Amino acid sequence: AYLNPRFHWTDLKVSTEVTSHNRDPNAPPPKLRKYEQARVLGGGSSINGQMANRGAPTDFDEWHDRGATGWRWEDCLPYFKKIERDLDIDDEWHGQEGMIPVRRVPEAQWPGHAKALAEAFERAGYKHLPDQNGFFEDGYFPVTISNQAEQRVSAAIGYLNADVRKRKNLTISTLTQVTELLFDEERRCVGV
């Protein structure tokens, strides 16, 4: 699915060049490159690498400090926990009842290049961390993936199970592009 243009917005472009307020106004605009965004039920979780990566807490706190009210790390962590059902770790950083199972690739299953990288990181003084989404510090760790029994679990698979698909107030329309979201007075989305 990842390479199939039917499952992507093929004309999206983005600049990855850093720009700042003191950029030369006569400089040419930054180059644009293709921006991969899924156009399939389940979104990026249906086509990307099954990674279950959280951003660094300092990034969330910076967004809040720049005006994104409600985006502090402590505001977002409950939602990360609500989403996931961690199959490996049960602690204050992880959820146990969410719809998306997450697990880590055991070191015994790491390919040769990953083991070589781990050895190089170890020699460089980085420590092995059991979890990339736990206490945040520098180190190397097993990859956390949204996968169970060697099967991808996309948002569509996790949330749109057989019981949900039977709901009378749910219509799934693939091959359809949403142009507007309708919200009620409580700012809850009630239609498209």
Give, region by region, the residue ranges found by the protein language model.
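N-terminal redox-cofactor-binding region of secreted/periplasmic oxidoreductases
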Residues: 1-192
